[in-house]
């Protein structure tokens, strides 16, 4: 049975974004395979699991609330593509509303093996502002 047919992809997608929205870094780490590679717009290289988890942890700690407005999610055998608007309120009093396209591959063990995330890195700048 393929990953798509087993319903694993729907579960992984829902759990990942729900975990980030709910500040649950433990679940995020559990969903990532040990060999996962993650690339974000603006990155010069892929990140391994530890660095990828640190980036998500930073985002969770830099924000007080996060919400994903899913525009579209399409599944393919072994993964999915999602377009969404990420709404987040920063601890520094700022807010972001970023349009994102993310491609996620899921291995046969039901763990994420690859993430490619496309967005305008400049839209994260308000969260980095410590002058507020």
Language-model regions: role of each:
Residues 25-29, 33-76:
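A solvent-exposed, acidic/Ser-Thr-rich amphipathic alpha-helical stretch
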Residues 6, 48, 124:
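Short glycine-/acidic-enriched loop or helix-start segments at secondary-structure transitions
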Residues 12, 24, 51-52, 111:
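Alpha-helical structural motif
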Residues 19, 42-46, 115:
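Short N-terminal micro-motifs specific to bacterial/archaeal maturation
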Residues 1-34, 129-132:
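Short, low-complexity N-terminal intrinsically disordered segments enriched in polar/charged residues
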Residues 16-19, 38-39, 88-89:
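Alpha-helix C-capping/helix-to-loop hinge sites
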Residues 3, 57-132:
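A beta-strand edge to alpha-helix "cap/lid" segment located at domain peripheries
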Residues 13, 20, 32, 52-59, ...:
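Hydrophobic alpha-helical core bundles mediating ligand binding, dimerization, or RNAP-core interactions
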């Amino acid at each position: 049975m393929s990953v798509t047919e087993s319903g694993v992809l729907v579960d992984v997608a829902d759990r990942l974004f729900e975990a980030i929205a709910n500040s649950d870094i433990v679940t995020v780490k559990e969903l990532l395979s040990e060999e996962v590679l993650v690339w974000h717009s603006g990155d010069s290289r892929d990140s391994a699991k530890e660095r990828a988890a640190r980036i998500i942890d930073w985002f969770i700690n830099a924000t007080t609330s996060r919400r994903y407005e899913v525009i579209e999610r399409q599944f393919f055998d072994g993964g999915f593509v999602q377009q969404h608007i990420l709404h987040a309120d920063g601890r520094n009093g700022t807010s972001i509303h970023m349009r994102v396209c993310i491609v996620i591959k899921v291995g046969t063990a039901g763990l994420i093996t690859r993430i490619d995330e496309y967005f305008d890195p400049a839209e994260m700048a308000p969260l980095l502002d410590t002058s507020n």
